[in-house]
Curated annotation (Swiss-Prot):
GO terms for molecular function: ATP binding; metal ion binding; protein folding chaperone; protein-folding chaperone binding; unfolded protein binding. One of its GO terms (cellular component) is cytoplasm. Heptamer of 7 subunits arranged in a ring. Interacts with the chaperonin GroEL. This is Co-chaperonin GroES. Belongs to the GroES chaperonin family. Disulfide bonds: none annotated. One of its GO terms (biological process) is chaperone cofactor-dependent protein refolding. It is found in: Cytoplasm. It comes from Mycobacterium marinum (strain ATCC BAA-535 / M). Together with the chaperonin GroEL, plays an essential role in assisting protein folding. The GroEL-GroES system forms a nano-cage that allows encapsulation of the non-native substrate proteins and provides a physical environment optimized to promote and accelerate protein folding. GroES binds to the apical surface of the GroEL ring, thereby capping the opening of the GroEL channel.
Length: 100
């Protein structure tokens, strides 16, 4: 995982999606048009968190750089930076952190 010069704002998270499966368990090759959009990725950068209702302190996020997360299928915004594809997600789009 390369370091990127993108710093998410507030409760946003920068994720690099894991590669989609290219073959089935029985060895059949899956064409690009039939591949499922991956819902798992690695957190590359994390914003500082959003402000609380009083605007006095930041609410920290539940994820950190390097975490593997499962996120909502249609959540986030896809971007390309430095030849790599990333996803900028809101903290609400993250469904779970995968234990290593």
């Amino acid at each position: 995982m390369a370091k990127v010069n993108i710093k998410p704002l507030e409760d946003k998270i920068l994720v690099q999606a894991n590669e989609a499966e290219t073959t089935t368990a029985s060895g059949l090759v899956i064409p690009d048009t039939a591949k499922e959009k991956p819902q798992e990725g690695t957190v590359v950068a994390v914003g500082p968190g959003r402000w609380d209702e009083d605007g006095e302190k930041r609410i920290p996020l539940d994820v950190a750089e390097g975490d593997t997360v499962i996120y909502s299928k249609y959540g986030g915004t896809e971007i390309k930076y430095g030849g790599e594809e990333y996803l900028i997600l809101s903290a609400r789009d993250v469904l779970a952190v995968v234990s290593k």
